[in-house]
Structures are given as structure tokens and as C-alpha cells.
Amino acid sequence: MTDYLDDGCELDETGSVVPSDDSVASIGNKGYHSLEAAITEAKEGATVTLLKNVTEDVTIPANTTVTLDLNGKTLTNESSHTITNHGTLTIKDSVGGGTVDNVTHAKGALVNYGNAILESGTLTRSKEAGSSPSTSGGNSWYVVDNNKGTMTVKGGNIVSTGKFSSLIRNIGDSTTKAQLTIESGKLSNGFIAVKNDDNGDLKISGGEITSDDQAVQNWSQAEISGGTMNGAVYTWAADNSAGQMTISGDAKINGNVYSVQYVYTDNEIVHQPIVSAATKIEGGTIVGNVGAAYSGSAPNTLGVVTVSGGNFPYLYRKSI
């Protein structure tokens, strides 16, 4: 009977076909000796289930739609990014405790050039060594780099304890925007949690984002309509570009909200923003200061904050 079984399959004690004991991943009842092999063979919309803790660099090709079920196991990188996605990838964890980890300097747990959805599970960098904004410790990077991709966080955890690199970078270019939507889940970092970089489109409607520094740092277009930000929310301007932020709905921000002008000197030339960072507050609750600020020398133009709604309990307490 076993002569007729596919490679990666065996019979259990009941005679049912199951993945072989040495398989690290499966699609249905067929096992594979590497996660990459399973993904390569996956048909449109297939679910690849991790069966063991595995060390491997994985690439999702373009025009591939696949779900990765961590199944309570840990996927750790070998030398590069743990997962590089060019296709459509959903990450979930049907058991609990499943993790995508990266342990290498300048590499991430997930680099997304395609379409990625995080439903459950944890993305992290367990060897992150950044101890301050100026000290990488020789091992630091983003946990997630959404690079000209589309990513939706529907649940799960994205966590790091580092204080050198942002937790998530959302960055596009002049031809392709990056789109990051956070609907739920928990994000936590010792430094900037969500960096919405150049040509990034950020929408936050839920979840909890915690940072010892900035929960959100915005250099492009951002909307926060829900969720809880434990940390500052800053919108920045530099040179000829400026971030635009709208805060509304039932968003709660436990931290300061500022529009910041960034002034810097390069080869003895002072670079001033020629446009203003702008924050519109239409709703939500802000437990912190609200205003305009600058980094570096005094700017020629100030950031703009417009308030048409919202609750400000911290400001009220200070005025008593």
C-alpha cells in the first residue's frame, strides 16, 4: 500500500494518509521537508501548515495566494528576511503561540512587496539589540517592512523591545504607495511603533499600539479613527514634503500629539521645510499635550494643528 503513497505521506495506525514524521510543513495530508517546498507546490488559496519549529528563509512568489498557519510553531530565519512576500499571504495561528522570528541584523520577520494579512500569531525579532536611538547593538531592524505593499493587521501581535529601529515601516515610492491598515491586534516597541514613511498611506481603526517613544510617526498620509495609542503621535515635515494626519472617531491617544517641523544642516546648508506638517483633530480622546513643535533649529514655518472636535482631559486638568 505504501508504494502508492506520495512522497511526504505515510499511513497512521488507522490506515489514514498523514504527513510523514520528518515533514516540517503540510498541505492537507501531504508533508514537505521544507516550508519553501510546500509554498512552491501550493495551489491557489491553499493553506500551508507548519508542523515543526523550523529555521528557513521563505519567499512567496508573485501571483501566489497562500495562507500560512503557524500551528503553534516558530519559523526563524536562516540568514535573510524570514518571509519575503511578493504574492498574497495570510498569516494565522490556529493553535496559539505561533511565531515568525528574525535573529539577523538588518533583516525583518516580514518584508512585504505584495498583499499581506496578519490574522493571528506573533511577528518579532527576538535578538533585537538596539538600546537607544543611536545604538543598534549590532543587531537591529524593523520587524515588518511594508515596502510598496498592501498590508492589513486584523489581529495577532507585532512586538519588539528595541530602542533603535521602528517596529513597522510603511514606505512607498513616487509610483507605488504603501498601504497599511490596522484594524486590531497588539503592536509594541521600545522606540517608534509605526513609522509611516514617504509615500505611505496609513489607516488605524482599532488595535492597541504601545511605544516608549512615538506610537505613530507620520511623514505622509495617516488617519486614526479608532484603537488605542499608548505613546506620542507626531506628524513631521522636512524639505518639500509634509505629513498630513487626521484623528477622529473613538481613537484614544495616551500621549502628546504634535505637528513637527524638521530642520537639519548638511554641508553647512540649513534645510528648512517649505510646507507645514498638519494635524486635524475631529474626534477621539487625547490624554496629552497638543500643539506644534520643531526638531533642530527654529523653522521658518510652523506646523499646523486644527481642532474641530475631540476630548482633551489632560489639557482640562492642567488649566484648573
Q: Where on the chain are the PLM-derived regions?
A:
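Surface-exposed loop/turn motifs in large extracellular/passenger domains
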Residues: 1, 59-67, 84-101, 108-128, ...
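A recurrent domain-boundary module in secreted/ectodomain proteins
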Residues: 3-21
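Short domain-boundary/entry signatures in modular proteins, especially
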Residues: 18-26, 75-78
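Acidic Gly/Asp/Thr-rich repetitive segments characteristic of extracellular carbohydrate-active
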Residues: 21-51
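Short strand-turn-strand beta-turns centered on an Asx-Gly dipeptide
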Residues: 28-29, 71-72, 250
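Glycine-rich repeat segments that build the extracellular carbohydrate-interaction surface of secreted
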Residues: 41-55, 66-73
